[in-house]
């Protein structure tokens, strides 16, 4: 009898603990003040927290802002790009890419300034993950260690370290000479792509952001460009502008059905 009573009490304690964690996680999402320095910290403090919009204040930063936290997978990812349809245009100018646009629960771009504020603390290391969905039901991913952006004066120059995944290292390119690591961000009104012009067969390219239809860290255009025009199933192959990760679906330009880019502190 005594053993049964202890077991029942144990179950009661565990149930109460789980309920408390669940309530705390919901309160976190509804709170208006900062709930952590980034999504990774929130997840570590509350492993039961669900995916959704949270308020964060990066270490050493005076301002706080909303982000979408992906708490599935291994938890604690801060989403900075999401594409799943054509309702939100990504063909925008510098200020829009700097400050962000879209709905954080749907398709959006968090903003280069916010990503810089997250990653500028050199005492922390960050991993970037790119998730891709094709039009045939398949998925792929690419992860990069030591992700970081420089400030606006350096045009939010990209740095990535070691690659792992099954989508291919499109950031460094499908062939030599188009490595986007170390390149600044380009938009239709601010060109940093290194083309003057770039020659592709019989085509002379002067502005990659213009032909690709969205802002990106272009290096003579390159093999990665996930902010171009979205294309529906059946019309997703052969376009110069698209959701391109050319090491994943060669040789013709294949535009992904959906993409998500996110970072995590490690």
Model feature map: region roles:
Residues 2-266:
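Mature extracellular or lumenal effector domains of secreted proteins
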């Amino acid at each position: 009898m005594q053993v049964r009573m202890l077991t029942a009490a144990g179950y009661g304690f565990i149930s109460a603990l789980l309920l408390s964690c669940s309530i705390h996680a919901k309160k976190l999402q509804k709170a208006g003040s900062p709930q952590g320095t980034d999504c990774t910290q929130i997840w570590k403090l509350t492993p039961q927290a669900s995916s959704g919009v949270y308020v964060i204040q990066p270490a050493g930063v005076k301002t706080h802002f909303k982000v979408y936290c992906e708490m599935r997978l291994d938890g604690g990812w801060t989403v900075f790009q999401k594409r799943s349809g054509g309702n939100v245009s990504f063909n925008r100018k510098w200020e829009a890419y700097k400050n962000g646009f879209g709905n954080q629960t749907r398709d959006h771009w968090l903003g280069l300034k916010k990503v810089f504020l997250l990653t500028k603390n050199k005492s922390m290391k960050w991993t970037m993950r790119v998730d891709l969905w094709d039009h045939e039901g398949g998925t792929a991913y690419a992860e990069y260690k030591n992700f970081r952006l420089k400030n606006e004066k350096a045009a939010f120059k990209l740095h990535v370290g070691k690659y792992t995944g099954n989508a291919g290292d499109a950031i460094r390119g499908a062939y030599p000479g188009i490595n986007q690591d170390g390149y600044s961000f380009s938009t239709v009104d601010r060109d940093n792509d290194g083309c003057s012009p770039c020659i592709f067969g019989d085509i002379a390219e002067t502005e990659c952001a213009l032909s690709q239809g969205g802002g990106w860290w272009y290096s003579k255009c390159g093999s990665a460009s996930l902010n171009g025009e979205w294309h529906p199933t059946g019309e997703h192959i052969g376009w110069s502008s698209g959701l391109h990760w050319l090491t994943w679906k060669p040789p013709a330009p294949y535009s992904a059905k959906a993409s998500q880019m996110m970072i995590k502190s490690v």
